[in-house]
UniProtKB/Swiss-Prot annotation:
The gene is cpr-1. Its main location: cytoplasm. It comes from Neurospora crassa (strain ATCC 24698 / 74-OR23-1A / CBS 708.71 / DSM 1257 / FGSC 987). One of its GO terms (molecular function) is protein-phosphatidylethanolamide deconjugating activity. The keyword Hydrolase applies. The lineage of its organism: Eukaryota, Fungi, Dikarya, Ascomycota, Pezizomycotina. It catalyses: [protein]-C-terminal L-amino acid-glycyl-phosphatidylethanolamide + H2O = [protein]-C-terminal L-amino acid-glycine + a 1,2-diacyl-sn-glycero-3-phosphoethanolamine. It holds the Pfam family Peptidase_C54. Keywords: Autophagy, Cytoplasm, Hydrolase, Nucleus, Protease, Protein transport, Thiol protease, Transport. It is found in: Cytoplasm; Nucleus; Preautophagosomal structure. Cysteine protease that plays a key role in cytoplasm to vacuole transport (Cvt) and autophagy by mediating both proteolytic activation and delipidation of ATG8. Required for selective autophagic degradation of the nucleus (nucleophagy) as well as for mitophagy which contributes to regulate mitochondrial quantity and quality by eliminating the mitochondria to a basal level to fulfill cellular energy requirements and preventing excess ROS production. The protease activity is required for proteolytic activation of ATG8: cleaves the C-terminal amino acid of ATG8 to reveal a C-terminal glycine. GO terms for cellular component: cytoplasm; nucleus; phagophore assembly site. GO terms for biological process: aggrephagy; autophagosome assembly; mitophagy; piecemeal microautophagy of the nucleus; protein processing; protein transport. SUPFAM superfamilies: Cysteine proteinases (SSF54001). This is Cysteine protease 1. Residues 1-21 are annotated as: Disordered.
Amino acid sequence: MTSSRPSGRDSTGWQETVSNTSPKLVNAMEAARAGAAEVGRVGRRFLYRIWDWEPVNNRTINEPVWCLGCSYTLDIKQYGSPLSSSSLSQLTADTPPLDKSQLAATHQHQDFNGVRTTATATCLSDTSMSAAPTGSQLGSFDTVPDSVTSGYDSALAYEEPGQDGGWPPAFLDDFESRIWMTYRTDFALIPRSSDPQASSALSFAMRIKTTFSDLTGFSSDTGWGCMIRSGQSLLANAILIARLGREWRRGTDLDAEKDIIALFADDPRAPYSLHNFVKYGATACGKYPGEWFGPSATARCIQALADEKQSGLRVYSTGDLPDVYEDSFMAVANPDGRGFQPTLILVCTRLGIDKINQVYEEALISTLQLPQSIGIAGGRPSSSHYFVGVQGQRLFYLDPHHPRPALPYREDPRGYTAEELDTCHTRRLRQLHIGDMDPSMLIGFLIKDEDDWDTWKSSVKHVQGKSIISVSPYDPARGQGGGRAEAIDEVETLESDDDGEPALGA
């Protein structure tokens, strides 16, 4: 198996040399190395904050922008209610071909230049897409700029009328309707581990914090919980779509939205709380409270908690390799053969060593264009985001690195206030070029029925570039048939730290 872990000689040679002189010197050098890595991470974060300008859409090119399988463009020619089948042929040439089962809607809006435009939104139905749209269908990614970056920075982007950055209003409405989980503060204490090794598993910053303070536990996940929050976001949106449908938007069916938000309150009584992620991570994944999670540990927590809490959504995880086995999947989605249950597929993968290998870029982009898409939890090195949209080679994400007061647990979810719900949504776009993504990630897909399953299988197979997901009939672990012999050579291992997985943290 190809491994991203450096060889033992390369990684420990200096320690062996110095340890013959002084063990204390080894510890000091190890601390210095960890400190240097932390300084580099904080420096990158500082630069990202300074130049984290809102992206602006190039209205002249009007390239489609996608959000979890729905495509949006500005269209100055059309306005009105959802298009009839006879109107589908009038869609812009930039939008991939549609059939009569596709749903399109237009929205009139006054953009930031005062020009009245309409936005065309196209959501592909579960049965209308046998293969993911490719880069060639959407225009050349290499020759046309997809979006530009504005010269201002504001956390209140697009909140005022007309300040939409040139993006289709329907796209912003869709983006804002995605559930967004972030750092929280002042929640019920998560006790520190009494294991002597727990401290060494923490990041350098957390070690400093816990060493020089009388910290008996964690009442905030700032600095270590971003991968858990990204995983919560992915799970929350899967539950949202399974219950309310892909067309749900903010402001409709508030009670149903509150029921879902309550599942993720920052309290041990909430089924999918940070507390329960940490609890399961400690018992089953070897993750200490305050330690960064990686994609693999996050996927295992989601699967275990979903199985235990009976949310109406089933979860199938591929483990550390991106191979989906149909017999194992069906054992989760339809175990008794009496009825298919909505099932979330979680694919853990690593698409390179330090950055994503270019041969996988088209296939990765297509995962956000599939109608079954639930997004990607991953991001920059040691910094996880939740990716839900794409335009060209720019991916749009929800950033969990924004501390907010703890989301309270309520016995009656109808008691949540509008202000509390607002903390779980944002209209502020952030983008990252695919070449800047960390190669370790967790990809989610929601399969609603068997037709959806058949469509998804074909879609992940027929992609531009090299496929990042394989679907095989039988799981070798179940004693039937054999796995793909080439899978071991194709996939980079997820192991890159001492715990067997890359940790995406602060």
